[in-house]
Design a protein with these regions (language model features):
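Basic/aromatic-rich interaction segments and small domains that mediate binding to polyanionic partners
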Residues: 4-70
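Histidine- and aromatic-rich ligand-binding microenvironments
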Residues: 1
């Protein structure tokens, strides 16, 4: 999943207790930092950022809001 694009909505696949983040929290890709590494921003329901950190693609799952074909 190295081809994440800016503004992709993703879920965290592992806890990051040092940053106060838990598996399943939803964030937005801000930019690609290196191959397979992305800056992800986590915001509350009011749009206030509470964490921004670099994450590898294997720590993230892309979330889809539109119907996506399988197969």
């Amino acid at each position: 999943m190295e081809n994440l694009k800016p503004f992709a909505v993703v879920a965290l696949l592992e806890d990051k207790p040092e940053r106060g983040l838990r598996r399943g929290q939803v964030g937005t890709v801000v930019e690609s930092l290196a191959p397979g590494v992305f800056e992800v921003e986590f915001c509350d329901n009011e749009g206030r950022t509470y964490a921004t950190l670099a994450l590898r693609s294997d720590q993230l799952m892309v979330l889809h809001h539109d119907l996506v074909g399988v197969g």
